[in-house]
Amino acid sequence: MVSTTTFLMLTSLATLTSARSHLTVTIGSNCTLKGPQGGHVFWWRIYDNGWFTKPCDQPGRFFCNGRDLTIINVTANDKGFYYGTDYKSSLDYNIIVLPSTTPPPRTTTFSSSSVANNTISNPTFAALLKRTVNNSTTSHTTISTSTISIIAAVTIGISILVFTITYYACCYRKDKHKGDPLLRFDI
């Protein structure tokens, strides 16, 4: 029962791919994954074939300080999905490993100091800001990823339950002569 619950939990977590943070790391470097700000964080590594491990149980390869997970000397085998939770909140990472000869992807950083160099006129900027605010409000017609993951977990649970009941009904069907005498209504 515990393995089924764990499987359902990790299956529902796997459906949350759109909320996953993608990190690109080069081979030989160290990578620190920040955990939720709550209490003690439990980390899981989820493989493509459905297996999962606790990286904090592997000293020397990983370093856990109770909240963050550091992957020491990243190798090509460290690519994959890492999930950290304190059972109140969670963070999900997808680690992409590049060879050390490949330059890291170019990142662009925006800062608040760029507002002084604004070339957009005030009315245009106000219209653009209004349009952005109107478009960024959440629509009531979209379904959040957490709702989809809960629905997926419930569907899998119900299908396992139906399969178990069907299996029991087909394989353990009692004959007429083997029935419980208290449940027979023969008079």
Curated annotation (Swiss-Prot):
Keyword flag Glycoprotein: yes
Domain of life the protein comes from: Viruses
Residues glycosylated per entry: N30, N73, N117, N134, N135
One protein family per Pfam: Adeno_E3_CR2
Key words of the record: Early protein, Glycoprotein
InterPro entries for the chain: Adeno_E3_CR1, Adeno_E3_CR2
Family recorded in the similarity comment: Belongs to the adenoviridae E3_20 family.
Protein name: Early E3 20.6 kDa glycoprotein
Organism per entry: Human adenovirus B serotype 35 (HAdV-35)
